[in-house]
């Protein structure tokens, strides 16, 4: 999922418990890892999060349901969606896990030169060369207590394997 860097940082600082969208996720994606691409300034895969609930309604309802109606930054949502936007969605986030090392867009393009990271989200399937790279990256660099001993060496090895798989 692509998220502007400013909001991605808030998610991983755990000061933002909801991600607001115009379109909801599919129900099948609830409680699954959703990898976050920090767009705009950063251009990196920063970590993952899970969504436990999808709230839908107009802007006012969603702001109240999430508590953003009393937060100082609640006005940003109204500014973006409009006061009476009828199809506002809020994704309730949990298990937010940042990577020790970020996977850059430049490195992703070494694996898949045609990668397209849309504004909302895209699926990366098992037959995609990036699938195994992201899975290995997650195992090696998730800040969940399982840190690797030599991040630089591990990063190079994961990217090398990804490039080799792409060539096959």
Describe the predicted segments one by one:
Residues 3-25, 41-46, 54-168:
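Contiguous surface segments at macromolecular interaction interfaces
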Residues 26-37:
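Short coil-to-beta transition motif at edge beta-strands of beta-rich domains
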């Amino acid at each position: 999922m692509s998220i502007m860097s400013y909001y991605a940082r808030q998610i991983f600082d755990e000061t933002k418990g909801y991600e607001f969208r115009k379109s909801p996720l599919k129900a099948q994606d609830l409680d699954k890892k959703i990898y976050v691409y920090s767009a705009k300034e950063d251009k990196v895969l920063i970590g993952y999060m899970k969504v436990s609930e999808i709230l839908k309604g107009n802007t006012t309802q969603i702001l109240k349901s999430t508590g953003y109606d009393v937060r100082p930054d609640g006005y940003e949502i109204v500014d973006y969606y409009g006061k009476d936007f009828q199809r506002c969605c809020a994704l309730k986030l949990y298990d937010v896990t940042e990577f020790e090392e970020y996977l850059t867009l430049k490195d992703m393009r070494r694996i898949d030169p045609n990668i397209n990271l849309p504004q909302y989200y895209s699926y990366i399937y098992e037959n995609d060369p990036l699938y195994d790279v992201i899975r290995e990256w997650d195992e090696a660099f998730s800040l969940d207590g399982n840190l690797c001993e030599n991040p630089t060496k591990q990063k190079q090895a994961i990217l090398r394997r990804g490039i080799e798989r792409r060539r096959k």
